[in-house]
């Protein structure tokens, strides 16, 4: 049985090292791997001994925590209906503002194409009886999101038979043949958790852990890659809780009542893992259940535009049917009042697999490397020492 367990764990770790598939699982035996300290010797007494004190039971570990998510599996978390202008019908231009209508939400259940997050932090763990860890991380994180424009409710007004947009005009077309991507700045991030070695038999250890993480980075850059309305915004601002129509000055430098776009990230995770110590190597394999959410308050961001036209244009949006600006300088053939919203996103899969190994030196220092897959493709590195 021991040989079989060794073979399974070693094969899992070595087989996953060639490819990397928010929160790491960690080695279940970590609370009991470093039993000696660089300043104080470890204590191996009996917890039931009446002469034992809490000073003997508690130890401290410090180190580096790096977590690199290359692709988190996310989907939008929105309502099935979306309020905007009624869809155009026929070939006639619109002589009046579009009628508000409740339409099928193109963002409902949309999967994100790419979601990345990179965290570097300090790691601190309080150990009790070489069996339990209470730990936290303090550091910084940055992220990247990319998805189809439908997932961001990219909309605009088309076919309006007027020379300028009116205050009561609302979008009537949804753009789904485009891509939206955003980069966040580097923001403060923290996490807390607990880990326990629940069962030990020889060199095998079964353990469990629970963690919670939070961060709120601001959107540093927003790119909309669309033939009908392509634009980039640095440090975008938008409207929270604002229904259509947006303010007529939305997207201009004089727009008011806007706020910075930021993403509130929360995640919790519970895991169960099994490890087996092989001299200085301790490979492990574990399963995890997690839920992550990315909430930007459904902020709506308007395409940048000029307050007054220059060369009969307020944006660089091209003509759609090729007719260009007619003699009356009407806006019929160009996309107007373009905007998008940052919808709430959540985990598309709750269960994942983690495979890793820990290298221990002199019972005082340890380095853990881990890969995760199924619900995300990620890598984790943790280096620490015991006082």
Swiss-Prot record:
InterPro entries in alphabetical order: Major_OMP_Chlamydia (IPR000604)
S-S bonds: none
Keyword entries, A-Z: Cell outer membrane, Cell shape, Disulfide bond, Ion transport, Membrane, Porin, Signal, Transmembrane, Transmembrane beta strand, Transport
Location in the cell: Cell outer membrane
Residues of the signal peptide: 1-22
GO molecular function, one term: structural molecule activity
Domain of life: Bacteria
Topology of the protein relative to the lipid bilayer: Multi-pass membrane protein
A GO BP entry: monoatomic ion transport
Gene Ontology cellular component list: cell outer membrane; pore complex
Described purpose of this protein according to its UniProt entry: In elementary bodies (EBs, the infectious stage, which is able to survive outside the host cell) provides the structural integrity of the outer envelope through disulfide cross-links with the small cysteine-rich protein and the large cysteine-rich periplasmic protein. It has been described in publications as the Sarkosyl-insoluble COMC (Chlamydia outer membrane complex), and serves as the functional equivalent of peptidoglycan. Permits diffusion of specific solutes through the outer membrane.
Family statement: Belongs to the chlamydial porin (CP) (TC 1.B.2) family.
Assembly and oligomerization: Part of a disulfide cross-linked outer membrane complex (COMC) composed of the major outer membrane porin (MOMP), the small cysteine-rich protein (OmcA) and the large cysteine-rich periplasmic protein (OmcB).
Name of protein: Major outer membrane porin
Gene: ompA
